[in-house]
């Protein structure tokens, strides 16, 4: 019963889409209507509003961190263990991907996964974030950076901690993240993927809104 509650609470936390909420609060176009149509920080950046993108990034990462941190923090009080943490990790991630509050149409989970990893272990989270930053810096492809980070995250976890139940949730998150980027993979291969900072499509969408 405790793990079921953990799953439901974590999923609901994950279902809060900061990309949509922040954009609406700041009078911007719905991120699901322009660019990649993905409600995430990278696509919000295409609106040209860096503050909105940063707030989205922080919010999506925070909810991932919060769900896992709460589970660990209250583990002693409610008899929770690493299995509970693993459940919280995948549940909050699924909430972001398929949010009940937004017709189950969510983002791709990069920032939320980063928050989850930081909560599981700061070193694991930082190593994965550095992987994303290095690839993104040299290629300006957010999607390629995310794919590389998704591949390396389980490897970092295995190197740091060996076989453990939480690793299963990390592998599951990585697999889902790669699956959610399947269209991006096709665009990367075709040389048609948008780079970080590309906001032409967003500006067109915003002008149509007014």
From Swiss-Prot:
NCBIfam families: glycerol-3-phosphate 1-O-acyltransferase PlsY
Gene Ontology annotations of biological process type: phospholipid biosynthetic process
Quaternary structure and partners: Probably interacts with PlsX.
Compartments, record wording: Cell inner membrane
GO cellular component, one term: plasma membrane
Annotated PANTHER family: GLYCEROL-3-PHOSPHATE ACYLTRANSFERASE-RELATED, INNER MEMBRANE PROTEIN YGIH
Membrane topology summary: Multi-pass membrane protein
Function of the molecule: Catalyzes the transfer of an acyl group from acyl-phosphate (acyl-PO(4)) to glycerol-3-phosphate (G3P) to form lysophosphatidic acid (LPA). This enzyme utilizes acyl-phosphate as fatty acyl donor, but not acyl-CoA or acyl-ACP.
Catalytic activity: an acyl phosphate + sn-glycerol 3-phosphate = a 1-acyl-sn-glycero-3-phosphate + phosphate
Family the UniProt entry places it in: Belongs to the PlsY family.
Gene Ontology molecular function, alphabetical: acyl-phosphate glycerol-3-phosphate acyltransferase activity
The entry's keywords: Cell inner membrane, Cell membrane, Lipid biosynthesis, Lipid metabolism, Membrane, Phospholipid biosynthesis, Phospholipid metabolism, Transferase, Transmembrane, Transmembrane helix
HAMAP family attached to this UniProt entry: PlsY (MF_01043)
Protein name: Glycerol-3-phosphate acyltransferase
Residue ranges crossing the lipid bilayer per the database entry: 4-24, 52-72, 82-102, 118-138, 159-179
Cystine pairings recorded for this chain: none
Major site of localization recorded for this protein: membrane
Pathway: Lipid metabolism; phospholipid metabolism
Organism: Paraburkholderia phymatum (strain DSM 17167 / CIP 108236 / LMG 21445 / STM815)
Keyword match Chaperone: no
Assigned EC number: 2.3.1.275
């Amino acid at each position: 019963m405790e793990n079921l509650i953990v799953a439901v609470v974590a999923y609901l936390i994950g279902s809060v889409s900061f990309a949509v909420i922040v954009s609406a609060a700041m009078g911007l176009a719905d991120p699901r209507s322009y660019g990649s149509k993905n409600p995430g920080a990278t696509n919000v950046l295409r609106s040209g509003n860096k503050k909105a993108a940063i707030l989205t990034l922080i919010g999506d990462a925070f909810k991932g961190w919060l769900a896992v941190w709460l589970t660990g923090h209250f583990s002693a009080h409610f008899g929770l263990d690493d299995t509970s943490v693993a459940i919280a990790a995948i549940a909050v991630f699924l909430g972001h991907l398929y949010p009940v509050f937004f017709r189950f149409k969510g983002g791709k989970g990069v920032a939320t996964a980063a928050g989850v990893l930081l909560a599981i272990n700061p070193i694991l989270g930082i190593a994965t974030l550095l992987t994303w930053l290095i690839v993104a810096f040299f290629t300006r492809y957010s999607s390629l950076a995310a794919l590389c980070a998704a591949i390396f995250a389980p490897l970092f976890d295995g190197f740091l901690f060996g076989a453990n139940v939480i690793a299963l949730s990390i592998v599951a998150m990585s697999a889902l993240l790669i699956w959610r980027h399947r269209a991006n993979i096709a665009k990367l291969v075709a040389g048609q993927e948008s780079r970080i900072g590309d906001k032409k499509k967003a500006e067109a969408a915003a002008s149509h809104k007014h």
